[in-house]
Amino acid sequence: LQKSVSLDKNTTAAQLHQKMILESIILLNNTLSKTKDGLVEKITQNDKNDLKKAPKIKKELLKIDFDKDIYSVHNLIRGLSPFLENKQLLSGVEICPSAWFYLNNKRIKVQKTLITKIKNPNSRIDTDNKNYLHINFRDKALSLEMIQPEGKKPMDIKSFLQGNSIDVTDIIS
């Protein structure tokens, strides 16, 4: 048996992981029941030679390249994110190592972002130093929602900004 799982434009790897665990329990029970009753239909699998292995996740893949388009960056972050919901992170699973970048030579892991409108188009970084921190792209901004500064615990952006002052001229790489 098979089952599709729906995703939205902000679903993270950890959220998909949890969703698949729940769906697989139901699917396994249905499969066992149908197998017992002789009602399972065979599904032809792809030829083994046609399958492509996923690449090993290397450190270079995790580094955010802000020269890419906003959707590629947002999707990289989502695809590597341990963020579940309400500041909760999936732990003990190597599939969610977090994408990262440098802010003034300090590594920042990014767990959650949203794509939003640009508020200040005159700089790469935009912040009010209280509520939001945006990285501006060509026509949209990437809102950093949940991050983990080097040597610190994960935190929402408001908590980060309480103890850190960001200037629009700060360097991201």
Predicted regions and their residues:
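Donor/substrate-binding cores of folate-linked one-carbon enzymes
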Residues: 1-60
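Internal anion-binding site segments
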Residues: 48-173
